[in-house]
């Protein structure tokens, strides 16, 4: 098995030095779906090669670069530079533009794109192949959606559903996740490790698999006690999830903005209250022992 893995790593590294994987959307339990914070309309989703522009909106998320002039706390992309969560969320919150003719046309085009993709069945491993001719259409279509419908919400158990598009072999999983519940994706130190309950298949040592141009479902669990309280881009109670793989040439991934369902928020608050009560109880017991 180790020998086979070594062969795969060598082969993929030699032929796919620039291959990527990107977070394309977040699907809220409240029925609201928004694109990933790095998504760029027009980026090909049916092409595995860098020459076609398929890597333009993939986030490169390297710890040594985060929070510097080179990359924000959410990384950087080839097509847009440092990732700016505020800029994308401002678009989601632009309620004044939601009924403009070009935005309505973008929504219609995006709906047709989604309908075409919905006819395909998942393959082994849970991934769905991207139809020929597919490109990113979700960004302009999302104009004003959060202003009228709210941000996507977690499920009541605190998990958030995300879609990860694997461009090529070293854009595979498994992924790791971090969630910022306080700074709106601005502060590197605000991110907490989060558990992924549904992951993208792949060799964790290098983010490799044989899949390409496929979409995979991902589910991320909010850290216990975390409550979405960030304010960014005109939105409040914002959480940011940042996902990435272990690709040697990356890591690659992306990020999404969301909030908690009322039930999930209540659970988090109750968890924190229980922790405080337990801490006070321990302190009282220690005083009594003295």
Curated annotation (Swiss-Prot):
Residues 121-140 are annotated as: Disordered. The gene is GAS2. It is found in: Cytoplasm. Residues 1-19 form the signal peptide. PANTHER family: SECRETED PROTEIN, SURFACE PROTEIN MAS1, PUTATIVE-RELATED. The keyword Signal applies. InterPro entries: Egh16-like (IPR021476). This is Appressoria-specific virulence factor GAS2. Induction: Expressed specifically during appressorium formation. Appressoria-specific virulence factor required for appressorial penetration in host and lesion development.
């Amino acid at each position: 098995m180790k020998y086979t893995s070594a062969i795969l790593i060598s082969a993929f590294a030699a032929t796919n030095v620039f291959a990527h994987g990107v977070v394309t959307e977040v699907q809220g339990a409240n029925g609201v779906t928004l694109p990933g914070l790095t998504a760029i309309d027009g980026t090909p989703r049916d092409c595995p090669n860098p020459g076609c522009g398929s890597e333009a909106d993939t986030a490169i998320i390297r710890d040594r670069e985060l929070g510097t002039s080179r990359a924000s706390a959410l990384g950087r992309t080839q097509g847009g530079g440092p990732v700016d969560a505020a800029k994308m969320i401002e678009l989601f919150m632009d309620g004044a533009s939601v009924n403009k003719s070009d935005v309505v046309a973008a929504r219609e085009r995006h709906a047709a794109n989604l309908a075409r993709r919905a006819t395909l069945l998942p393959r082994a491993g849970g991934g769905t192949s991207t139809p020929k001719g597919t490109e990113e259409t979700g960004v302009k279509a999302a104009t004003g959606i959060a202003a009228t419908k709210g941000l996507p919400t977690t499920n009541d158990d605190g998990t958030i559903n995300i879609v990860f598009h694997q461009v090529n072999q070293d854009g595979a999983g498994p992924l790791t996740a971090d969630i910022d519940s306080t700074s709106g994706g601005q502060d590197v130190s605000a991110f907490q490790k989060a558990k992924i309950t549904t992951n993208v298949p792949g060799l964790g040592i290098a983010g490799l698999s044989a899949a390409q141009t496929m979409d995979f479902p991902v589910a991320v669990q909010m850290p216990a006690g975390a409550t979405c309280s960030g304010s960014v881009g005109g939105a409040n109670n914002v959480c940011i999830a940042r996902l990435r793989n272990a690709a040697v040439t990356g890591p690659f991934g992306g990020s999404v903005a969301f909030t908690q369902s009322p039930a999930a928020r209540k659970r988090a608050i109750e968890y924190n209250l229980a922790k405080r009560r337990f801490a006070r109880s321990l302190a009282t017991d220690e005083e009594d022992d003295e």
